Amino acid sequence: MEPSPEMKRKRRTKDKRVLRKALQCICFKKRIVVLFMEWNKTYHRRKICIIFFSVVLMSMVLCGRLVYLMLFEGKYYETQAKDLQQRERKIKAARGKILDRNGVVLADNKSVCTISVIHNQIKEPEAVIAMLVKELGIPEEKIRRRVEKYSSLEKIKSNVDKETGNRILAYGYAGVKVDEDYKRNYPYDTLASKVLGFTGGDNQGIIGLESVYDKYLEGTDGLILTTTDARGVEVDNIGEERKEPVAGNNLRTSLDANIQMFAMQAANKAYIQKEADSVSIIVMNPSDGAVMAMVDYPEFHLNEPFQLIEEYKEYEGTKKEQEYCNRMWRNQCINDTYEPGSTFKVITAAAALEEGVVSLEDRFHCPGYIVVEDRRIRCHKTTGHGAESFVEGIENSCNPVFINVGLRIGADHFYDYFEQFGLLHKTGIDLPGEASTIMHKREKIGLVELATISFGQSFQITPIQLATTVSSIINGGNRVTPHVGMQVENGDKKVIKTFDFPVQEGICREETSEKMRFLLEKVVSEGGGNKAYIEGYEIGGKTATSQTLPRSAHKYISSFLGFAPADDPKVLVLVIIRNPSGIYYGGTIAAPVAKEIFENILPYLELEQ
């Protein structure tokens, strides 16, 4: 059926409306495209401008940086570049000498070589390996590993003697370096080994004076600078630059090489004759604490410090080797404590005189023992000394007399004297590893403990502590600091530094000091220390025999402490013999050792009879 005219009209109107909308849409899209194209042109222009100005700015910054580096940092980067082309080798500085008080050299240096290789410079590796094996006696495998190792400088061996170093140098092999070096040398080898100490592979002090005064003894290493190409090969036509080493300063000590030898000979003799475990001897000036000799026998070999002494040879190559090296290096004069026994009666007597609880005329009775609380404490003379004065009690080293004196002082006051005399603190000696006093706490000291303390048992001190405290009592009452270092000198003997050691005045009265010198002279001239007596000399002293712990082991320590001249002491000697065989009484075996030392050193020191 054909549509009516009205329907046709409506359809045409609708089609026109659709067409109009389509045209409007097309026009809108066209407009958008036109706008986008206009915006795109603006965007690209802006982008180009930003990129352009960024490039210009970056160029200006880079140019400015280059100008800055060239003008202001040029030398720095030139040095950096040069460093990349330079190889440095150290020139070891000579270590300072250690001298005795008279300038005798106790430690110096031996000129040696260090052999190294530079892998990329070696042209004949097999010949180099064969030569190094032959000259150095090192297994081929070890040499080969180091020669073939890619490194700038590989050390083969240090401390090579000069003759061997010169022979290696004479081969003329490229890549083999022979550098000058120093090895510590001890002219007397075992003399004062535990005092001097030794150095390690880096030439730094390990123990003893070498360790304590290392900062003065060590020098400043020098350098050898060589120029290399891109492959690390040294350029032949450019000479080496050298920065010369600066040697260390010398240390002058209070030791006297001759007195040290006298003491060491006496210790060696006692060690052999008495089949002892060890012998320690200290010789010092009681007026200022200067140590003139210190022996702890057996000593070790300073030039071969890791070689065990004969007594420890069985431990070589075992797991205990290092343990016995440490034992061998240990200085029992300062590192170990012991019960001083009757030598401590010097301190008990001084405390009693200071406290005013005893006089030289006081009378005592010794039946051979004394009962304190539930303990029966015997005298070394089991039959007893009978009636005796305080002076005779010291001469006889009578335990009951000193127990009575200790009880008079009282635990509290006795502890105060430990503090006053400096016994509860380290002496401050300039040697490493000083041990502390082992003592009861004040509140733990009962009557039995007080009784045993009064004659030198139930507590422990070091030998240097005993020597220092007695020195302070007999020198007028000044607590000195024992020391070995005296001053630092340069190679021209100019003094750079003098060491001052503290002195505490007034630890006891001059009157007490005078009485103690009188009492101790009587011990040697008339009492138990008579085996140290030397005709023509006034010598004061005190003997001791003490047991080690545990008591059940029945091991003893025999000792004697003496000084001369008795009225004005200039030298003090302490002798300690550990676990002697046979007779072990201090007056019998330690006093004669001290006498032998006095017989040698009193004339040597020109002390008048």
Q: What do these predicted regions represent?
A:
Residues E2-E311, T337, S359, D412-L424, ...:
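Periplasmic/cell-envelope proteins involved in peptidoglycan metabolism and beta-lactam response
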Residues E2-K8, K29-L35, A107, D229-E240, ...:
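Beta-lactam-recognizing serine transpeptidase/beta-lactamase-like catalytic domain environment
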